[in-house]
Amino acid sequence: MVRRLGTVGYNVLLPNLYYRAGHDTIFGPDVLEEGSAERARMRAVRTKMTIPPVMDDAAAMLAFIDSQAEIKRGPVGCHGYCMSGPYALAAAARYPDRIAAAASFYGTWLVSDAEESPHLSLNKVKGELYIACAEHDSLAPLPMVEELLALFGRAGTVGEIELYPGVHHGFAFPLRWCYDKPAAERHWERLTALYRRRLG
């Protein structure tokens, strides 16, 4: 997926979100199976990955980008899938003068009771947001999507929330059982169009 975005002409930085659990943290193939030991281990690690430390990581990534002479200084885009969807939105709010475009694909916990829930800072975003939601998604259910739509409008956020009909959480990843090629291709089209508009 990183290579595909790179072929469009962008420099792409892919962070290891799990590095706090060890730089060599990996999960076996059964991490995709509900009830498996690997999935439980992944969830235990994930619960410690709250937005504040990830925003510190985002600051470090922006500093790294700025230190690279071969990368033209300018607006930055970010996007995330599943649990990293809220990180992308939070980063757009935390660094509004740098992040001109952000996208979340079947992002979880976009609206929650957490103090750092992304919906609370939509009004701080200066860039454009694109949020794609799956119709069948227990991790980002339709009531949350409907609430987010209302909040989006009230905050005056520039962007779009789109519901992908008939697909499941994880539809963009080719190795998942829920992979849906037409929806996955649409997500690429929407993402690259967003980046072209905002990043050039």
Map each language-model feature to its residues.
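N-terminal cap/leader regions of alpha/beta-hydrolase-fold enzymes
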Residues: M1-G200
